[in-house]
């Protein structure tokens, strides 16, 4: 069986919390019991809808939605396919993209008796939200908020006969005055969890790729998908 290579992940040099792709995911704390509706956008186009029930009696503490899997334009005059989820009201809504070019963002609205109200917009992450980025290309990267920057150095795994097991995710905090810390060093595929103390968004660009190494000095660093932030 041939191994499936996610070319979008391998080639990606820019990650944005406001336009999710295969190397980024978002965790949002639901916070309150209720009925919610979600609108999935890709660029300026709506591509999916979903409903979310949150209650203290629900066992699941996390609901995970693959935006690439549920995306799809309905036939003219037809509604979007129904996607229904449930989660404990103290749990998390996890958004990620498994394949494709990305560019997704989500609005979540609470359903009131007379009107709905937007309670979450993934383009503007707030206190309690998490943006999880997985950088797989060695080199120097720059993390940016609207008025702040930070440097991230991504190291390639050392040569070895054993498969590389990345360390637990590293952490960065987005504050009103900038990133904390302002410099970070991680291994390829390790994962970085961005927490938020202020409303913002994060973009990460590869600014200086590491020099190519010979085949003998390379160690296999397989991207296994989203890092486990519970470790």
Tell me what each language-model feature is.
Residues 1-231:
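Extracytoplasmic copper-binding redox domains, predominantly the cupredoxin/blue-copper superfamily
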């Amino acid at each position: 069986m041939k191994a499936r290579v996610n070319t979008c992940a391998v080639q990606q040099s820019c990650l944005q919390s406001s336009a999710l792709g295969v190397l980024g995911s978002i965790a949002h704390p639901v916070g309150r019991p209720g009925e919610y509706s979600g609108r999935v956008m890709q660029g300026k186009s709506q591509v999916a809808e979903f409903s979310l029930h949150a209650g203290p009696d629900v066992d699941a503490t996390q609901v995970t939605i693959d935006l690439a899997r549920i995306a799809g334009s309905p036939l003219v005059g037809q509604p979007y396919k129904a996607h229904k989820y449930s989660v404990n009201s103290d749990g998390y809504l996890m958004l990620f993209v498994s394949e494709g070019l990305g560019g997704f963002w989500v609005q979540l609205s609470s359903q009131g008796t007379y009107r709905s109200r937007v309670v979450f917009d993934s383009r503007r992450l707030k206190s309690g939200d998490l943006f999880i980025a997985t950088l797989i290309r060695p080199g120097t990267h720059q993390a940016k908020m609207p008025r702040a920057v930070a440097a991230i150095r991504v190291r390639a795994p050392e040569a070895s006969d054993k498969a590389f097991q990345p360390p637990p995710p590293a952490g960065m905090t987005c504050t009103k005055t900038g990133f904390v810390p302002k410099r970070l060093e991680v291994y390829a595929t390790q994962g970085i969890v961005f927490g938020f103390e202020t409303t913002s968004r994060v973009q990460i660009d590869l600014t200086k790729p590491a020099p190519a190494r010979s085949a003998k000095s390379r160690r296999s660093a397989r991207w296994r998908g989203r890092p486990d932030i519970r470790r």
